[in-house]
């Protein structure tokens, strides 16, 4: 049975906020209370005050569970969410001839559409359910604002007023590993051949792409310097390189395989903000990521400080998202029956907050990253556990032992991975 209460949540909530007189500029436009004003000041204005001008948008984000105190403030995103909901809800209609956007205290005017009028427009017999709008149903401009960072003007207007994330949740600042790389062909470490033999197990990554929760492609990286996840073709004339020349390019699979036309459209829209991509590097210490693209990127991994809440990667910052030593410690505890099998995966979510309460199938683009060696250890641990045997795993395997174990593990678990439209067997 259709639940019509879901579509009334915004209407009821907004009327309550107007009547509360708690939000400056949010007032009734007429005595009949059929129209209302909502403040609409641009975040780039010199006199923009986040606490005042974004208060109603923040309140909606809190109500929807998209923001809680201590999270990083994102006024532009809050505003886009409410605008999207207003524009798509049958309960509201913008009255453009009453809106004033060119004055010092700009505002928009919306009319509350009576239910009888809605029925006349839709037809009682074919009205169907009026459910609360989702972000996937936003128009092009709304989607564009939801998935990318605010413009430079917006950002500069709000940066002084946006509280930083709590100190406890801030990642440690790390040196830019990629910026320190020498030219192609120069050894990264003295005696590089030996180094490569011992550490290739940790430098190789298995990268899996999920669109709408479905696996659409996989790749394994082989370059010790790391890789760049991007959409652009390598080596095209006039193409600007982002990162060292020696980086391996792993391309996002095309959106053609997505069955839903609407999802394909939105995914391709998101692609437009991922041109510069992200850089990935894997080593004995763990997995590191540097976001270069304009589109927002969120992540999860065992090295993320704050678990169970959205973790946004700041642009041009190097962040450790996976700690290999921590994985080994937890794996040892698992073998000693002192803990669960540790998760060796890192997940990047492009354009949408993650992790959150939304199911993974609702996410447009998820990229899962695993160190190949860690992946094989986890598989072996799962098998040994299922067989009832206990395999002793050293907390920190010596390099020579790693090098001996690695070929054997890989030989027994051959599989094909997708990269650059080729099948690659490891």
UniProtKB/Swiss-Prot annotation:
Its main location: nucleus. It is found in: Nucleus; Cytoplasm. Changing residue 80 to A: In IMD32A; impairs transcriptional activity by disrupting the interaction between IRF8 and DNA. GO terms for molecular function: DNA-binding transcription factor activity, RNA polymerase II-specific; DNA-binding transcription repressor activity, RNA polymerase II-specific; RNA polymerase II cis-regulatory region sequence-specific DNA binding; sequence-specific double-stranded DNA binding. Changing residue 197 to T: In a breast cancer sample; somatic mutation. This is Interferon regulatory factor 8. Gene3D superfamilies: 2.60.200.10, Winged helix-like DNA-binding domain superfamily/Winged helix DNA-binding domain. InterPro entries: Interferon_reg_fac_CS, Interferon_reg_fact_DNA-bd_dom, Interferon_reg_factor-3, SMAD-like_dom_sf, SMAD_FHA_dom_sf, WH-like_DNA-bd_sf, WH_DNA-bd_sf. Pfam families: IRF, IRF-3. Changing residue 108 to R: In resting macrophages, no effect on cytoplasmic subcellular localization. No effect on nuclear subcellular localization upon IFN-gamma induction. No effect on transcriptional activator activity. The keyword Cell division does not apply. SMART domains: IRF, IRF-3. Interacts (via C-terminus) with TRIM21 (via C-terminus). Interacts with the BATF-JUNB heterodimer. Interacts with BATF (via bZIP domain); the interaction is direct. Interacts with COPS2. Interacts with SPI1. Transcription factor that specifically binds to the upstream regulatory region of type I interferon (IFN) and IFN-inducible MHC class I genes (the interferon consensus sequence (ICS)). Can both act as a transcriptional activator or repressor. Plays a negative regulatory role in cells of the immune system. Induction: By IFNG/IFN-gamma. Negatively regulated by microRNA-155 (miR155). It is linked to Immunodeficiency 32A: An immunologic disorder characterized by abnormal peripheral blood myeloid phenotype with a marked loss of CD11C-positive/CD1C dendritic cells, resulting in selective susceptibility to mycobacterial infections. Immunodeficiency 32B: An autosomal recessive primary immunodeficiency characterized by monocyte and dendritic cell deficiency, myeloproliferation, and susceptibility to severe opportunistic infections, including disseminated BCG infection and oral candidiasis. Keywords: Activator, Autophagy, Cytoplasm, Disease variant, DNA-binding, Nucleus, Repressor, Transcription, Transcription regulation, Ubl conjugation. Ubiquitinated. Ubiquitination by TRIM21 in macrophages, a process that is strongly increased upon interferon gamma stimulation, leds to the enhanced transcriptional activity of target cytokine genes. Ubiquitination leads to its degradation by the proteasome. Predominantly expressed in lymphoid tissues. GO terms for cellular component: chromatin; cytoplasm; cytosol; nucleoplasm; nucleus. The keyword Cytoplasm applies. Belongs to the IRF family. GO terms for biological process: autophagy; cellular response to lipopolysaccharide; cellular response to type II interferon; defense response to bacterium; defense response to protozoan; dendritic cell differentiation; follicular B cell differentiation; germinal center B cell differentiation. Residues 7-114 bind DNA.
């Amino acid at each position: 049975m259709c639940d019509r209460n879901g579509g009334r949540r915004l209407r009821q909530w907004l009327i309550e906020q107007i009547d509360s007189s708690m939000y400056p500029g949010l007032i009734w436009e007429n005595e009949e209370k059929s129209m209302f004003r909502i403040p609409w000041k641009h975040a780039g204005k010199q006199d923009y005050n986040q606490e005042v001008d974004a208060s109603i948008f923040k309140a909606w984000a809190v109500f929807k569970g998209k923001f809680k105190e201590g999270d990083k403030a994102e006024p532009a995103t809050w505003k886009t969410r409410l605008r999207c909901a207003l524009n798509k809800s049958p309960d509201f209609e913008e009255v453009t001839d009453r809106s004033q956007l060119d004055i010092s205290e700009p505002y928009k005017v919306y009319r509350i559409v009576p239910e009888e009028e809605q029925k006349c427009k839709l037809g009682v017999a074919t009205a169907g359910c009026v459910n609360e709008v989702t972000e996937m149903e936003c128009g092009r401009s709304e989607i564009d604002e939801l998935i990318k960072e605010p413009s430079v003007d917006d950002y500069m207007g709000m940066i002084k007023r946006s509280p930083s994330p709590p100190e406890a949740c801030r990642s440690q600042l790390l040196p830019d590993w990629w910026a320190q790389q020498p030219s192609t062909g120069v050894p990264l470490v003295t005696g590089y051949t030996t180094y490569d033999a011992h550490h290739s197990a940790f430098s190789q990554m298995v990268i899996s792409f999920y669109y709408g929760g479905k696996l659409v492609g996989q790749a394994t990286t082989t370059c010790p310097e790391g890789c760049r996840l991007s959409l652009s073709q390598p080596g095209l004339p006039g193409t600007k390189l982002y990162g060292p020349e020696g980086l391996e390019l792993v391309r996002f699979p095309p959106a053609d395989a997505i069955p839903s036309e609407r999802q394909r459209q939105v995914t391709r829209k998101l692609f437009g903000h991922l041109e510069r991509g992200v850089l990935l590097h894997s080593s004995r210490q763990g997995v590191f990521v540097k976001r270069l693209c304009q589109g927002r990127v969120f992540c999860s991994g065992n090295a993320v400080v704050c678990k169970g809440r959205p973790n946004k990667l700041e642009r041009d910052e190097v962040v450790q998202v996976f700690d290999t030593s921590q994985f080994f410690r937890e794996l040892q505890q698992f073998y000693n029956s002192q803990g669960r099998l540790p998760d060796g995966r890192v997940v990047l979510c492009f354009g949408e907050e993650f992790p959150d309460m939304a199911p993974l199938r609702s996410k447009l683009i998820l990229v899962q990253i695993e160190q190949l060696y860690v992946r094989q250890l986890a598989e072996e641990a799962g098998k040994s556990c299922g067989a009832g045997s206990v395999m002793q795993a050293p907390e920190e395997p010596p390099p020579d032992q790693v090098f001996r174990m690695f070929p054997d593990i890989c030989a027994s678990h051959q599989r094909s991975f997708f990269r650059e439209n080729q099948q690659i067997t490891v």
